[in-house]
Amino acid sequence: MLPVFINLLRRLYFMRASRESAAYHSLPKEGISMDQSRAPIMEALENFKDMRIVPFDVPGHKRGRGSPELTAFLGQQCMTVDVNSMKPLDNLCHPTSVIREAEELAADAFGASHAFLMVGGTTSSVQAMILSVVKRGDEIILPRNVHRSVINALVLTGAIPVYVNPQMNDRLGISLGMSVADVKAAIEKHPSAKAVLVNNPTYYGICSNIREIVKLAHAAGMKVLADEAHGTHFYFGENMPVSAMAAGADLASVSMHKSGGSLTQSSFLLCGPSMNAEHVRQIINLTQTTSGSYLLMVSLDISRKNLALHGKEIFRKVVDLTTYAREEINQIGDYYAYGSELINGDTVYDFDTT
């Protein structure tokens, strides 16, 4: 009797899921993807909870019942929405409904042609970005002070790095951005390079002249990739350094969890109009998990909504607080919290005051 009962539950579930999927696809899409007050993954999870489906699928904690101690620690709400891919909730590898809509909303919020929800951290985003544009033997121009994910991507692809050595600030002991002249020289010396990678900003808040670098690279037929692990707020704050998408970059990896409010390990990969989004998705699917965490995805969805609606206000307050903190620290004596006074129009073209 148990197999019959299970099959009956499955039939009832998929009948309802099919109706909901059909209802979604019958909705007019114009305007929906622009409504930044929506969070489609969150909405789908709320609806899913109301369906009260008996779980015969992974994960094995069965929405918390199978692991009381973990449920007590994380909370029932968290365990209830830690679920597997299914029709009402879409599929991260090949999204067609709510995840696809969340991607469209993110792309609109960030000013990109397409956005991918990444659940392997910005490390996986950076690696997918590089894998999308270079292969074994191709050259890629990049600064020496890149993240280890970039180096690992070079190992995976077999691409050849052409390093641009950033200048150093000897007083602070930190590396700066790439000089436009040095990037231009690298492009001229390596005209067959496929791409230029830029940190926007560096870990220390230093920004190169990414607009000019984009112009130089595109004129030479090269793609521009931006590691924006620390630059989420550039897209939403006022009087911030220019974002990679606004500067015309082709791909950008954005650590939403670092300064955008989502859960640790969640990120976005942004595409400009020159990129084939489906090709990029294929590359992502080479390495990204087939068991995408809905906790991470819904955190991206909700955080994007929050920044799209309230980002200016949030980061205006952040700038005010950091400016106050910097001024107070610099009055103590023997301490120096550096700021926009480092800007020199080249290796420090702009500075992230947050």
Name what the model sees in each region:
Residues I41-E46, R52, L70-F73, H94, ...:
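Conserved PLP-enzyme active-site core in the AAT-like
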